[in-house]
């Protein structure tokens, strides 16, 4: 087997990172079995250093039980590890623990996973896999007896959403809205909760656009209001066109089912985290071999 093939085989068998596999093979004279032992012996020592790395991949998961819905994001460094069964088991363990213990957003940081605070709970897995593993964030929605919760996690675990509505409705209705929210990713539930600073920046952008377009000053105010209204409708969940029935807004779809949206959160893996440029597998191996 070539060195690249050995690296690939070792990575598949151990889920260790590319660089760690190369180091292990170099230290073991390209003997895969010895390299596996090397990884086990050296992993724990280097795990702490891995925590300095940027974890931009991972999964987002959503689930509800009784009157509680939980949304979490757990990060790793590559999509390869994001599909690893040990990583997925860890993420789901956090999800289940949150469903059992979390009552407000602050409780996420108090969770104990495998006997360790959640902030440290990924260290053992980091040592085993060779990538930074970390719980990033979580949200909770709770329903009273007259409300209904909806959750949706896409099958690739890359996007997910939770929603709370006033009214007792079928699970399919709220799941449809959660699915829509996960797909369309609106910034806000409705205009009442729109961030004023964000809105001011959007208005400023429109004003600058009009200056470049040379629009008549007499029509500027009307144009600004029109474009701003369009932006609000695109970014507020209740004002968006429902993807299954575009003639209806989400607000109208829920109203037709005797419900009103009152709470909403959605996550996408790695959003807001600066990502390094991606390399092909061959380029990554070549780069590591030069070190």
UniProtKB/Swiss-Prot annotation:
This is Elongation factor Ts. The lineage of its organism: Bacteria, Bacillati, Mycoplasmatota, Mycoplasmoidales, Mycoplasmoidaceae. Its main location: cytoplasm. It comes from Ureaplasma parvum serovar 3 (strain ATCC 700970). The keyword S-adenosyl-L-methionine does not apply. Associates with the EF-Tu.GDP complex and induces the exchange of GDP to GTP. It remains bound to the aminoacyl-tRNA.EF-Tu.GTP complex up to the GTP hydrolysis stage on the ribosome. NCBIfam families: tsf. Pfam families: EF_TS. GO terms for molecular function: translation elongation factor activity. GO terms for cellular component: cytoplasm. Keywords: Cytoplasm, Elongation factor, Protein biosynthesis. It is found in: Cytoplasm. Belongs to the EF-Ts family. Residues 78-81 are annotated as: Involved in Mg(2+) ion dislocation from EF-Tu. InterPro entries: EF-Ts_dimer_sf, Transl_elong_EFTs/EF1B, Transl_elong_EFTs/EF1B_dimer, Transl_elong_Ts_CS, UBA-like_sf.
